[in-house]
């Protein structure tokens, strides 16, 4: 996005967004209609996350070429590792949903303009599409429209970050730093079952891309979720990027373009190592036929020839590639001698495992010699992770979870800038109602390195994990129908 070609494409992007905002809402390429594709069909917290968004980006890029008049347009990516802030062209231009008069200003106008055309679209859905909506929790139009109204943001609140405050928050800067990105690219399998030991590149296997999230990989749970929430805001009133109408903020496509680029980096790393780049043969029977039924072509017609997840495992007919960015360096060292993963270690969760603000739920892990050995190795040879599973309250909006590691018997410093901080996670899509246990994976290399440096990581001796809800981004505690429950912590290496 900062290169000369990126700047040229950014201007074409502005032209395309301008054109989409001017299209009538009866046109499927209208800016808001395009956002509804995401609301009605996007997967999060499962193994279809990467391929679905590749299809969504690919058709959007083709639409931008058509409407901008630039047949050579390529969607720029926002390399937030190199530039952990919203860059100036995203403010004070058509790419700024807060300050441009081209955007719908408030909920009343949104309903006046969009409800009727979306109802007409709903009435045109095929039985297969309606089945997908029912799986998603939209048995009728009223359920969809209720979620749409909840996911829209009035213009003054449409984006949390501003030209005066453009930087990603500190937790998000950690989530996008090069160490986290390298950790996200290190796994060598495409996807695992939710409860399986070890680590995969994608979020876990799920029964459908329409159901609630089952777990988050490092890539999805750290840079993806964190950037969404840092840009959109962690507390009410939420901005667009914090909701499932997030594509209404033009930052969305620059953000997701970088996620897709990192998937391409991982794929090329796997190829360099002679390893598989997709689901296993056994997994393909479930993965490949998953229906993607809501994409739109550049001419405004529904996509009818590529309606399966398997169609988007490769870049294929979209025919693009990426200029090098952060993370590219994992490919030359991909064949360096990495240590074999250690057997997964299970922490014992305390009987009282409610996660509250500054009141941690805890778990105790007895350190193995294998963990000490791999933690002492450089990151090029081994990385360590913690998979934290929680049973969340029905509404996860505004909940920012922090994880700390300390020696047994010590009181952890519950400060994200302190010596015991290991990592953090939060949900994206605050209007999702999460009821089942969800896992989040965080890299813990740095936390274990600090324990080693202090002589506090020893085989046979316990370490304590503490999980709390952060003060920042919290809701009023009285508004929580129930606290989150810590259910499991697994530690391993990759």
From Swiss-Prot:
Top-level taxon in the UniProt lineage: Bacteria
Positions bound to Cu cation A: 38, 53, 64
Classification via Pfam families: Tyrosinase
Gene Ontology MF terms in the entry: metal ion binding; tyrosinase activity
Region forming the signal peptide: none
InterPro entries reported for this sequence: Di-copper_centre_dom_sf, Tyrosinase/Hemocyanin, Tyrosinase_Cu-bd
Residues annotated to bind Cu cation B: 224, 228, 256
Enzyme Commission number(s): 1.14.18.1
PANTHER family attached to this UniProt entry: SHKT DOMAIN-CONTAINING PROTEIN, TYROSINASE FAMILY MEMBER
Family per similarity comment: Belongs to the tyrosinase family.
Protein name per its UniProtKB record: Tyrosinase
